[in-house]
Amino acid sequence: MRTFRLFFIGLIFIMDMSLSSSDQCQQETVRLRAQLKTLEVQVMKQQQELIQTLSSQRTEQLALYQDTFHDLGDHQYRDCAQIFNAGNKGSGFYTIRPMTSPSLVRVYCDMTEGGGWTVIQRRSDGSQSFNKPWSDYQRGFGDLQSASGEFWLGNDNLYYLTSQGDYNLRINLADFEGVQRYAVYKNFKVADEKEFYQLQFGEFSGDSGDSLSGSYHPEVQWWASHQGMKFSTYDKDNDRYERNCAQEDKGGWWFNRCHSANLNGYYYHGAYSAVTDNGVVWYTWHGWWYSLKSVVMKIRPAAFEPNVV
C-alpha cells in the first residue's frame, strides 16, 4: 500500500512538471513570436527606407544628367569652341564630331576661363582606375555622365581633335591643402596610333612650373622630358626605360625614363610621402612624392576668339 502511494505521488509530481514545462514552452513560444513580429516590422521599415534612398539617389542622378547634357539636335560641331561660339555658354556634356572622326563623340565642355574648352581628362576622387590597357586608353574610359566624374577622353579622340589645327592645352591642378595651380602649353598635338599617339607641345606659361618639358633642370631633361614621347600602357611599352614605366607608375602616359609629370597615376586619398613616384604627380609644383587631389586637362583652338554677340 505504501508503495502504491509513493508511485501515485511520483506520478502526480511528474504530471505537474509536465504541465509546468508545457506552460513554459507556451510562454517561450509567445515571446519568440513577438520578437519575430518586431524583427519583421524592423526589416520592412529598413527596406522601405532603402527603397526611398535609392529612389532619391536615382532622381538626383537623373536631374544631374538632365542639367549637364545639352542636346543640340542635328547641329554638329568640331569641338567645344564652336559650340561656345554658337551661343551655348553653359558648361556640361555635348556631342561633337571632329573632322576625321568616324562617329559622334560625347564630351564635357568647360565654358569657364574664357569658354570653349574640350575636357580630355579629369581626376577628382579616385573613383576610376587609370591603370588600363592600351585598348581602353585608345577609345577612352570613365564617367562621362556626372559633371565631376573621372575619365580619359581617348587617344583616338585626342588625335582627331588636335589634327584639326593648333590647340592649346590647359592643365588645372589642386592639392589637398586647397591650393590651385595651372599650366598652359601651346601647340598641343597627339599623333595617331601608327605613331603610338606621340606627344608634341610648345611654349609653356602658368604658375605650376613646366613639368612636361623637363627644362627646369638640364641634367634630368634627357630622361624626364615628355616632348616627343610615345604613349605607353602596362600592356604596350613604348617608353625609353629598360623596364615598363606604365606598369610601375599605375597608369598610361607619355613616359620617357620615366616622368616628371604623370597625371594618370595612382590616386592616393590624401597627400603622401612614398618611396615611389606612382601618384598623380606634377614635379615642378610638389615634387615626385606628392599625389595631387584633382586635375583637369582641357584643350581649345589657339585661334579661339569668343563670340560675344
Question: What does each of the following model-derived ranges do?
Answer:
Residues T29-K37, G116-I120, G252-N256, G265-H269:
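Extracellular/mature segments of secreted proteins
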Residues H70-H226:
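Extracellular beta-rich globular recognition domains, centered on the fibrinogen C-terminal
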Residues T276-V309:
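C-terminal helix/juxtamembrane-tail motif
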Residues N131, R240-G287:
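Glycine-anchored, exposed beta-strand/edge motif detector
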Residues R2-G115, G178, P306-V309:
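Assembly "stalks" and propeptides
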Residues E219-E248:
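Extended, non-catalytic structural segments that build the interaction scaffolds
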